Amino acid sequence: MTRVLGIEGTAWCASAAVFDAETDAVFIDSDAYVPESGGIHPREAAEHMREAVPSVVEAALDHVESNWGDPADAIDAVAFSRGPGLGPCLRIAGTAARSLAGTLSCPLVGVNHMVAHLEIGRHRSGFESPVCLNASGANAHVLGYHNGRYRVLGETMDTGVGNAIDKFTRHVGWSHPGGPKVESHAEDGDYVELPYVVKGMDFSFSGIMSAAKQAYDDGTPVADVCCGLQETIFAMLAEVSERALSLTGADELVVGGGVAQNSRLQEMLTQMCENRGAAIYVPEPRFLRDNAGMIAVLGAKMYEAGDIISIPESGVRPDFRPDEVPVSWRDDEAVARPVPTDERRQGAEAVVDIDADGGRVTKRRLEKAYRHPVLDSRLRSQRTRSEARLTSEARRQGVPTPVVYDVDPDAGRLVFQYVGDADLKTALSESAVRDVGRHLAACHAAGFVHGDPTPRNVRVGEDRAFLIDFGLGYYTDAVEDYAMDLHVFEGALGGTADDPTAQITAFEDAYRSAGDGAVVDHLREIETRGRYQ
């Protein structure tokens, strides 16, 4: 059976581990860098890595020798984190891995750190094809497997979730890491309103941090700000995870990353999954924070698939995105599943009852138990009003949308005309995609965005495509906001379609022909903002 020694050194934690596939046992030895003040300084982190990596590797080798004898005979491969991360730290860990592989005369495996966060949860849960939420210091994204790669279904458009929280705690004067301190203070606080920024399945944290700092400076008790911070950020992560489950039809969620150690976040995600009838797996804390155990486990899967790397090709990649990794170790089904066609459907936000014979659809935005009641009530009412208003506005602009028959914002209830025969996810065609491009161009020309134009929010009829669910839409004259509409649609296509390239080209061509080409040009700039672009 396979036995792999893994080395982790992406940023702050020097770690070495041994994974024995026969027993599924994982030995981990770690030495984390703790700055004297402020956040992580790359030079100091690299100095720590230089001192700590040899000692954790030695501990791993001692473990091998005491259990299986000579490491040269007992170890099948050495795996290391190639990225993403801090370049100086990655290079130290990479050098150690190359040297050790040479000493042991065994193959070298280069692992993507973020995919390892996903795979350790999938490995230990036994899930077939889950959606994964990674919530760590420098990252926040939702992934799903499709056609040989993990696709980014949603991600932060600015800073990582942990780094965002740390920026607030440094402003307050607390030492690193800030997350546990926010969690502790939030227990004694009352909710305060902060910006809630979800765009399709992407999110942004910079505005929340600025508002939290301002609230603290204005005299709001720090415990209250911490409570508002947790309730807002973690509700965003839970909502986007639910949107990904709804988009793909998946019923499994795995969670990774150090921020996921937060008990309130785990509670929110568990409540969300229970309400959907989905299974959730949160690894034990030693596998959530940065660790070499996940590197060794994924390294073993890659080694068994023949996915090894030569020394000349083993350079580190500080900007190594998870969707760049060819997934050589699995060939099972994609995360995208068939969409139910029964008369009652559960989306990310609402339950929809369909009366096809009567030509009506009743949509109810249900209370979300995972969200703070004040936040939940505000979002449900706002989104119901926006959906009714913008659905009708789009129709006035010549965009095919359902007629709104009734609306009750306080109850989160709308009654619509039943339109289309299927949603775009199951009836994908170039002509329908072109319709979406033209429809969004018309909305933008009238000064508003859809907000969540995924394939699930497009209904396809015999001769046209209809836009539905404008709940995240709003009035705006910003090219940035128009381009985000395009980004959301293309990201959802990329995560669920077998070959999205032709559809994306048709979509952009149609948008350019009917709208402002500057929006498509701005889309290219937005695409550089995702983590490690």
UniProtKB/Swiss-Prot annotation:
Localization: Cytoplasm
Enzyme class: transferase
GO MF assignments: ATP binding; iron ion binding; metalloendopeptidase activity; N(6)-L-threonylcarbamoyladenine synthase activity; protein serine kinase activity; protein serine/threonine kinase activity; protein serine/threonine/tyrosine kinase activity; zinc ion binding
Gene Ontology biological process: tRNA threonylcarbamoyladenosine modification
CC cofactor note: Binds 1 Fe(2+) ion per subunit.
Family recorded in the similarity comment: In the N-terminal section; belongs to the KAE1 / TsaD family. In the C-terminal section; belongs to the protein kinase superfamily. Tyr protein kinase family. BUD32 subfamily.
Alphabetized Pfam families for the sequence: APH, TsaD
UniProt xrefs under InterPro entries: Aminoglycoside_PTrfase, ATPase_NBD, Bud32, Gcp-like_dom, KAE1/TsaD, Kae1_archaea_euk, Kinase-like_dom_sf, tRNA_threonyl_synthase/kinase
Region (Kae1): 1-329
Residues the entry annotates as binding ATP: 345-352, 363
Name of the molecule in the record: Probable bifunctional tRNA threonylcarbamoyladenosine biosynthesis protein
Function: Required for the formation of a threonylcarbamoyl group on adenosine at position 37 (t(6)A37) in tRNAs that read codons beginning with adenine. Is a component of the KEOPS complex that is probably involved in the transfer of the threonylcarbamoyl moiety of threonylcarbamoyl-AMP (TC-AMP) to the N6 group of A37. The Kae1 domain likely plays a direct catalytic role in this reaction. The Bud32 domain probably displays kinase activity that regulates Kae1 function.
Organism whose genome encodes this protein: Natronomonas pharaonis (strain ATCC 35678 / DSM 2160 / CIP 103997 / JCM 8858 / NBRC 14720 / NCIMB 2260 / Gabara)
Active site: 452
One GO CC term, this protein: cytoplasm
Catalytic activity: L-seryl-[protein] + ATP = O-phospho-L-seryl-[protein] + ADP + H(+); L-threonyl-[protein] + ATP = O-phospho-L-threonyl-[protein] + ADP + H(+); L-threonylcarbamoyladenylate + adenosine(37) in tRNA = N(6)-L-threonylcarbamoyladenosine(37) in tRNA + AMP + H(+)
Binding of Fe cation, residues: 113, 117, 290
Subunit structure, as described in the record: Component of the KEOPS complex that consists of Kae1, Bud32, Cgi121 and Pcc1; the whole complex dimerizes.
Binding locations of L-threonylcarbamoyladenylate: 134-138, 166, 179, 183, 262
